[in-house]
């Protein structure tokens, strides 16, 4: 991968999960990218805190085969690493993760996993960067209970 790629550090608890910083409503927020999740979601408490509206309801199938009804979904714009804006439709959920991006998000990118890093690249589209020193700050914040 070249230096125009986003680099995400693997979660200490799950090899399929990676962390990145994004900006929503002019606030820097930690985002979890899960290569094992089929759909992306955002917590209802995050929407309420940041005054983001939601709409529509849908049922989704979970990794274990069960179905979960998500009452709403919302369209938000995330600025990844200060360079690229990505518009995403996220389902609203009561899960503890504030923002989780799944394979529905990853389908928009060429991605590669090497060691403990996930590299995202939009090929012909504008690219964005994340400096490795910021990754370690994210991990430290995420390992502190209620740190985010």
UniProtKB/Swiss-Prot annotation:
<dbReference type="Pfam" id="PF13975">
    <property type="entry name" value="gag-asp_proteas"/>
</dbReference>
<dbReference type="GO" id="GO:0006508">
    <property type="term" value="P:proteolysis"/>
</dbReference>
<dbReference type="InterPro" id="IPR001969">
    <property type="entry name" value="Aspartic_peptidase_AS"/>
</dbReference>
<dbReference type="InterPro" id="IPR021109">
    <property type="entry name" value="Peptidase_aspartic_dom_sf"/>
</dbReference>
<protein>
    <recommendedName>
        <fullName>Uncharacterized protein 7</fullName>
    </recommendedName>
</protein>
<dbReference type="GO" id="GO:0004190">
    <property type="term" value="F:aspartic-type endopeptidase activity"/>
</dbReference>
